Amino acid sequence: MREAPHVLGIVLAGGEGKRLYPLTADRAKPAVPFGGAYRLIDFVLSNLVNARYLRICVLTQYKSHSLDRHISQNWRLSGLAGEYITPVPAQQRLGPRWYTGSADAIYQSLNLIYDEDPDYIVVFGADHVYRMDPEQMVRFHIDSGAGVTVAGIRVPRADASAFGCIDADDAGTIRDFVEKPLEPPGTPDDPTSTFVSMGNYVFTTKVLIDAIRADADDDHSDHDMGGDIIPRLVADGMAAVYDFSNNEVPGATDRDRAYWRDVGTLDAFYDAHMDLVSVHPVFNLYNKRWPIRGESENLAPAKFVNGGSAQESVVGAGSIISAASVRNSVLSSNVVVEDGAIVEGSVIMPGARVGRGAVVRHAILDKNVVVGPGEMVGVDLDKDRERFAISAGGVVAVGKGVWI
């Protein structure tokens, strides 16, 4: 039995998330609440911790206070055993400048790698919804002999132009890596599908350090992991693709096996929530064998009074539904829906209140939004467009703390 390698986790969590505005007006994208009890960053942290990778640095920058607080309050590991999940803000260690890209974030944080001296480094994004066992990907990386392994998910070739696409040979060596090509390549075994990058990488430590340092000296680089570092290593013949469909997570169902969602737009964020609410959900939050850990608030259970009901919905702790109807929706903690109100096909974040007789349809309400008695959201889009953001798919998004 071979000795377990020493692995350091680096989570890239500095994303601004402009396409998720107004949800990112006051917080970093990885801190956006999701699924009634979580933040987006909880998915990658849960995957790493479940795989027993317990030394993790989270690189932050943009409006990181709520993210830093969430990690410090909910992701405490045992310091006695040398375990940690620590947020690392941009520190200007190399001069008076902030991170200029994801690769520059690692370059400015090389001291973390030198201090830990790992054999391998997993560099994962912080804003995707999925379950994955990273240890299987690390094993694949070691066996492949590659310098970097890129996690790839298969999508229909016709839909792949929106992503970074991977062209690999039969052995899994990446021949080309192209951002949003007009003609995406097929996979070696299926010309109708394309490997697209999940933004998750496993590096042999020396390979990452050398590539990051070389990139830092390149004045023409954008200092981006996917745009600069990976193509550099592909050109050197050092990159392999890991087929995410081969990843086997304990307790996964046939429906949510290999589930992965990039929730970088309001429509994608909304659709991922709708994946949670059916009787047999596309993504199952209730897998006890590979749990997603989130907020650890001490709240009372949700309560339904005066005939209030919720159908095909997720309702968070501390919420009260009073003589109201909730359907096909995700409600976070401490949400109140008052008498006669109707909530349909919506995502309601913590502390929001829907007043007596109000109607909320096909909408996202951020934290502490108050919809007054008799008010309507998502019913008249022309009226809503004067006040709120509306996605291309017609989802109405109301920013944090707004009173309607």
Swiss-Prot record:
UniProtKB keywords: ATP-binding, Carbohydrate metabolism, Glycogen biosynthesis, Glycogen metabolism, Nucleotide-binding, Nucleotidyltransferase, Transferase
Q: Which residues bind alpha-D-glucose 1-phosphate?
A: Y99, G164, E179, K180, S197
Gene Ontology biological process terms from the UniProt entry: capsule polysaccharide biosynthetic process; glycogen biosynthetic process
What is the protein name for this chain? Glucose-1-phosphate adenylyltransferase
Q: Which reaction does it catalyse?
A: alpha-D-glucose 1-phosphate + ATP + H(+) = ADP-alpha-D-glucose + diphosphate
Q: What does this protein do?
A: Involved in the biosynthesis of ADP-glucose, a building block, required in the biosynthesis of maltose-1-phosphate (M1P) and in the elongation reactions to produce linear alpha-1,4-glucans. Catalyzes the reaction between ATP and alpha-D-glucose 1-phosphate (G1P) to produce pyrophosphate and ADP-Glc.
Q: Which family does it belong to?
A: Belongs to the bacterial/plant glucose-1-phosphate adenylyltransferase family.
Q: Which SUPFAM superfamilies match?
A: Nucleotide-diphospho-sugar transferases, Trimeric LpxA-like enzymes
Q: Which Gene3D superfamilies match?
A: Hexapeptide repeat proteins, Spore Coat Polysaccharide Biosynthesis Protein SpsA, Chain A
Gene for this chain: glgC
Q: Do you know which Pfam families this protein is assigned to?
A: Hexapep_GlmU (PF24894), NTP_transferase (PF00483)
Pathway note: Capsule biogenesis; capsule polysaccharide biosynthesis; Glycan biosynthesis; glycogen biosynthesis
Native source organism of the sequence: Mycobacterium marinum (strain ATCC BAA-535 / M)
PANTHER family (alphabetical): GLUCOSE-1-PHOSPHATE ADENYLYLTRANSFERASE (PTHR43523:SF2), GLUCOSE-1-PHOSPHATE ADENYLYLTRANSFERASE-RELATED (PTHR43523)
Source taxon at top rank:
Bacteria
Entry-linked NCBIfam families: glgC, PRK00725.1, PRK00844.1
Q: Does the keyword Thylakoid apply?
A: no
